[in-house]
């Protein structure tokens, strides 16, 4: 069914998830077949009962994992502006227009996907941390967001084809990278023409302990650093950078747009189209 285009195969460690494909013309056939199955079908009822048990188990495991990381999570959040204030400013930057397809790189708990759920046609979150993916998946399932999914993926080598998304977001993720320009180039690769990349991260700071205690590779970024990365990735910079001053960390929102695919095609990873197989 994967080869026929009815299902997508999403490897995650030793496990493999499957979902109905929504990326080609055969996906409508899959949805039509599903619609023909009566809700009272005995096998379907048993399957749904088992699915609910699996979801409950996932939610419990996700909550257990989050309890383990909650202290460090809250310690970081206490250093900058409240989360809701940051969400509001992000929505302001995105604007009121319809988004289309969204890619959240380093999705964590899936919060960005959730707050934009009613504005997108389809949402994908990628993360390397299986524990965080479990939290995000549980949150998305509990919210009933069937047009959103998460999968394991590396920000340096996204499991996506070229020019497949309209908006990519790196929300408080880039400071974990030892090579930010490559992350931004990879994000540019998957953007469609006129697609946008939004980076939310810390302004340059001197809180050195964040390296050792929280594994931050970079102590924030200057405007020039991000702008240079955007330009190197073939993106057109939006000069309207947003700033939310916190104590001691200030959060900034930079954004840029892809005017054409020419700049990224030369940097495209030739293996990209094989990653979903």
Please report, for each region that a protein language model flagged, where it lies by residue.
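A short glycine-rich, Lys/Arg-flanked "PGG" loop and its adjoining helix->strand segment in the class I
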Residues: 181-196
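A short SAM/SAH-binding and catalytic strip from SAM-dependent methyltransferases
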Residues: 166-179
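C-terminal alpha-helical "lid/dimerization" subdomain adjacent to the S-adenosyl-L-methionine
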Residues: 196-255
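Short, Lys/Arg-rich nucleic-acid/phosphate-binding segment
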Residues: 11-17
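A short acidic, Gly/Pro-enriched loop at the edge of an enzyme's catalytic core
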Residues: 156-167
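Conserved alpha-helix/loop element of class I SAM-dependent methyltransferases that forms part
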Residues: 81-100
